[in-house]
Amino acid sequence: MKKKLNTKKENNNFYILVNDLFLKIEDNLNLYENEIDIDYEIQDYVMTITFSNKTLIIINKQEPLQQIWLATMQNGYHFDYKNNQWICNRSNKNFWEIFENACSIQSNKDLIFCKK
């Protein structure tokens, strides 16, 4: 007999992980609010970050795939949650490394984010 997966529980855990990530992103962006012009908004689990040069970074959840997607000027990235971190499924880099680099490039400032 096949064991049914509890997708409701898995989805609840996914939402917790996504909420946690979005809160950490907000906290980190707010650290720089007096230093650089960054605006962001969140609507339906889509975060749009706008820099003073009008470039965008967009982060959203892909619930059916249980992934986070990140779109930057440089590329698009898909992240799976592995070993307590979001890992890019192509480069095996963690989310924060790619996100921090993209924000630094798009803001023309060296940004360092606290990941905890």
UniProtKB/Swiss-Prot annotation:
InterPro entries: CyaY (IPR047584), Frataxin/CyaY (IPR002908), Frataxin/CyaY_sf (IPR036524), Frataxin_CS (IPR020895). GO terms for cellular component: cytosol. SMART domains: Frataxin_Cyay. PROSITE patterns: FRATAXIN_1 (PS01344), FRATAXIN_2 (PS50810). One of its GO terms (biological process) is iron-sulfur cluster assembly. CDD domains: Frataxin. It holds the Pfam family Frataxin_Cyay. GO terms for molecular function: ferric iron binding; ferrous iron binding. Keywords: Iron, Metal-binding. Involved in iron-sulfur (Fe-S) cluster assembly. May act as a regulator of Fe-S biogenesis. Belongs to the frataxin family. PANTHER family: FRATAXIN (PTHR16821), FRATAXIN, MITOCHONDRIAL (PTHR16821:SF2). This is Iron-sulfur cluster assembly protein CyaY. It comes from Buchnera aphidicola subsp. Acyrthosiphon pisum (strain APS).
